[in-house]
UniProtKB/Swiss-Prot annotation:
Ca(2+) 1 binds at D78, N79, E156, Q157, D158. Keywords: Amyloid, Calcium, Disulfide bond, Glycoprotein, Lectin, Metal-binding, Secreted, Signal. Ca(2+) 2 binds at E156, D158, Q168. Its cofactor is Ca(2+). This is Serum amyloid P-component. Residues 1-20 form the signal peptide. It is found in: Secreted.
Length: 228
């Protein structure tokens, strides 16, 4: 019996290290190297088909090459929802494997606060970088983002949960990631930018379910890019 209890204790400890629910306020995921093995898998609080969403996060990288910032894959589509930084000042949003690209002024290297929202009824996608709105774009009007996703930070999924390419990997720090099943108002976006997110119900940095794979480290956030 003692051996069984000891084994269960060790198993529970190992499991808690691999899979955790944590308040990561004022902390970052550090992706310190280019790789095809280092990533964080996120487990959403709410799993449902999405006809609206808003996603916000902070990121800090000194890479000028393209890199994946947020990868949401389903069995039928690898780029069901993808945020991809093509280069400095240029980002692409993929929904259902279709994409739009948005461009704007951006300091480099410098931390960014990035938000995007999309509504199925109009197909309109909105973008906010460091609290400032960028040009709206339109894609996939009438579409529904599929449920049961594999959500990954640090890599771009070319297959469900895998198919990583180190030349698309993120190198840097990610923090304050939140996701809602609704389109936030401009006032809400500014609240998120100031550090007061209004009750995220899909992904919540303050109560995040995640699994670290490979060389990813949690550290205190030493930078701030709040714009207001």
């Amino acid at each position: 019996m003692d051996k069984l209890l000891l084994w269960m204790s060790v198993f529970t400890s190992l499991l808690s290290e691999a899979f955790a629910q944590t308040d990561l306020n004022q902390k970052v995921f550090v992706f310190p190297r280019e790789s095809e093995t280092d990533y964080v898998k996120l487990i959403p609080w709410l799993e449902k088909p999405l006809q609206n969403f808003t996603l916000c996060f902070r990121a800090y990288s000194d890479l000028s090459r393209s890199q994946s910032l947020f990868s949401y894959s389903v069995n039928s589509r690898d780029n069901e929802l993808l945020i991809y930084k093509d280069k400095v000042g240029q980002y692409s949003l993929y929904i259902g494997n279709s994409k739009v690209t948005v461009r704007g002024l951006e300091e480099f290297p410098s931390p960014i606060h990035f938000c995007t929202s999309w509504e199925s009824s109009s197909g309109i996608a909105e973008f906010w970088v460091n609290g400032k709105p960028w040009v709206k774009k339109g894609l996939q009007k009438g579409y529904t983002v599929k449920s049961s996703p594999s959500i990954v930070l640090g890599q771009e999924q070319d297959t469900y949960g895998g198919g990583f390419d180190k030349t698309q990997s993120f190198v840097g720090e990610i923090a304050d990631l939140y996701m809602w099943d609704s389109v936030l108002t401009p006032e809400n976006i500014h609240s998120v930018d100031r550090g007061f997110p209004p009750n995220p119900n899909i992904l919540d940095w303050r109560a995040l379910n995640y699994e670290i794979n490979g060389y990813v480290v949690i550290k205190p956030r030493m930078w701030d890019n709040k714009s207001s």
